[in-house]
């Protein structure tokens, strides 16, 4: 399977830096990496999607066409920008913003019906990891049980919560075992990405694992040259 790289700007990128980053990436991305790169700015960092060489996505959207949902963006906002790719289930939205499994299912089903490409994030906390691999498998299976795993526009990103933003990636053995288990659950055509303190130093080794189909990258993607270095490992 062709490997891919995704940049998640979270809420860290200044608005105009985000705009400049997108334009520069479009100009400088090498042809062998066209269609293998995704970028998820925050909402103010988005631009009308006229980009031909990479996929522009949104970090979040409310599962309605439009309406009285103060502070939210909806499918019509994204469609007006010609954006049809969405992150769902990121741990920061699960934990900080209390998005429940039932709400994540509602989001998934709504945007599946709109034929959006969905990047669905899963991952366990440290307390679960410390209980052993059986507990991890049960936890991740539960996170996936409410969504359509045969949806053709699905990408799954495994991000162990204890590794996100800690500068402590999961070990190569942990990634190998966990991705191997998840590959048994997922449709064989569904890409499975790893995220969690990915950086220039470890990205190439992680991509070398057969069951890792790409990377979802946080802070290491916030400087364009760093992200392009990681892209070069694809």
From Swiss-Prot:
Pathway listed: Carbohydrate biosynthesis; gluconeogenesis; Carbohydrate degradation; glycolysis; D-glyceraldehyde 3-phosphate from glycerone phosphate: step 1/1
Organism listed in the record: Helicobacter pylori (strain HPAG1)
Catalytic residues (UniProt): 90 (electrophile), 159 (proton acceptor)
Keyword Repeat: no
Annotated positions binding substrate: 8-10, 165, 197
Name of the protein described by the UniProt record: Triosephosphate isomerase
Keyword Magnesium applies: no
Catalysed reactions, semicolon-separated: D-glyceraldehyde 3-phosphate = dihydroxyacetone phosphate
Family statement drawn from the similarity comment of this UniProt entry: Belongs to the triosephosphate isomerase family.
EC number: 5.3.1.1
A Pfam short name: TIM
Subcellular location: Cytoplasm
Job of this protein: Involved in the gluconeogenesis. Catalyzes stereospecifically the conversion of dihydroxyacetone phosphate (DHAP) to D-glyceraldehyde-3-phosphate (G3P).
GO term, biological process aspect, one: glycolytic process
GO cellular component, as recorded: cytosol
UniProt keyword list: Cytoplasm, Gluconeogenesis, Glycolysis, Isomerase
Subunit structure comment from the entry: Homodimer.
GO molecular function: triose-phosphate isomerase activity
């Amino acid at each position: 399977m062709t490997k891919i790289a995704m940049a998640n700007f979270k809420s860290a990128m200044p608005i105009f830096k985000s705009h400049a980053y997108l334009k520069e990436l479009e100009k400088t991305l090498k042809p062998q990496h066209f269609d293998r790169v995704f970028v998820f700015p925050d909402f103010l960092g988005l631009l009308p999607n006229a980009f031909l060489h990479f996929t522009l996505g949104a970090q979040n959207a409310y599962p309605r066409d439009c309406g009285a949902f103060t502070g939210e963006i909806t499918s019509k906002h994204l469609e007006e920008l010609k954006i049809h790719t969405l992150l769902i289930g990121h741990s920061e939205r699960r934990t900080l913003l209390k998005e429940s499994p039932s709400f994540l299912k509602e989001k998934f089903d709504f945007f599946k019906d709109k034929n959006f490409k969905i990047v669905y994030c899963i991952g366990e906390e440290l307390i679960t990891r410390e209980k052993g691999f059986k507990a991890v498998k049960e936890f991740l299976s539960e996170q996936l049980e409410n969504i359509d795993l045969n949806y053709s526009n699905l990408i799954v990103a495994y991000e162990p919560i204890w590794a996100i933003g800690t500068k402590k990636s999961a070990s190569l053995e942990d990634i190998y075992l966990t991705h191997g288990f998840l590959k048994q659950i997922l449709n064989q055509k569904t890409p499975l990405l790893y995220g969690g303190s990915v950086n220039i130093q470890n990205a190439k080794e992680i991509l070398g694992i057969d069951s890792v189909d790409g990377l979802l990258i946080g802070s290491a993607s916030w400087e364009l040259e760093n992200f392009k270095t990681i892209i070069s490992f694809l």
